Amino acid sequence: ARSQNGVDGWQIDSQPTLMPSPKEYPEEIWGIEDPRITFVPELQQYVVTYTSFSRGGPGVSLALTKDFRTFERYGVIMPPDDKDTALLPRRIDGYWALIHRPMTKLGAHMWISYSPDLHHWGRHRLMLEARRGAWWDANKIGLSPPPIETSRGWLVFYHGVRHTPS
């Protein structure tokens, strides 16, 4: 959907804004979902992180756009099993920072990873663990909207699952 002012007068597009492209990006063979959009002033573009699905499971893919009509796709940047991803809107100590939720032997926790170029990611660090016990977020946690920078630090919202999504 598009609007001149972002408040009213919305026009629904006849086609989805970003469609899977499995011939060029085989990790999208079973579809794409769950985009997180971050405007990055340094790039003067929007960075869209999204979940791409293939036989290997959900992975994290990234695309850049200025107009939401054309996209420069980077393809998969975090291999399966990973999702719930967003980029911070500015570099941290010279590196791009990405919050994501890989499924590891440790569980479904939130991690932060760093990249010099948005292609190559490393310095993976556990950021927030799902709680143990009967809490609403005791089994899995994941990032909700992209982080918001405040005068007191980064505000991060997350969702959680105890045993099942319902």
Kindly label every feature range from the protein language model.
Residues S144-P146:
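Active-site/ligand-binding surface loops and adjacent short beta/alpha elements
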